[in-house]
């Protein structure tokens, strides 16, 4: 799958990882994929950016109740009162973290990038027993459909093929969020 993905080399430091003790969660020479086609569809993944706010906000807020059920207990996201400006600042933070290789948020987009249809998050481990934590969602109208099924197949294959993890954890997939929250914190050593 690596040949399907273009890559981008990071260009600045890893401040969050230093603060959390995960300075070396990725190899120094790791180049993250910048475009990942979703097989059998016209959809693709790419790193989200601040300029995507006008696409992201309706996707998130249009699926907010379900997303809160999934991510709310762990991340307190997305808040009911989130404004477009708060979303813009959140996407700016994601864009900066991606560039620094602190964490990754990939938008699921249609072919012409006119709509965000979901996201994939790839993060350093917060809980013991993994070297990367991965979660994803699709907008409400795609739940249970072909696009969600394709993403469910793609993400673990893509992580195995293109990411340097030996023990990735798929939150909400191979472990419930409740069980994940009960795990001890990851060691910072």
Place the predicted regions along the sequence by residue:
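A short acidic/glycine-rich loop-to-helix N-cap element
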Residues: 143-148
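GNAT-family acyltransferases
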Residues: 2-142, 153-189
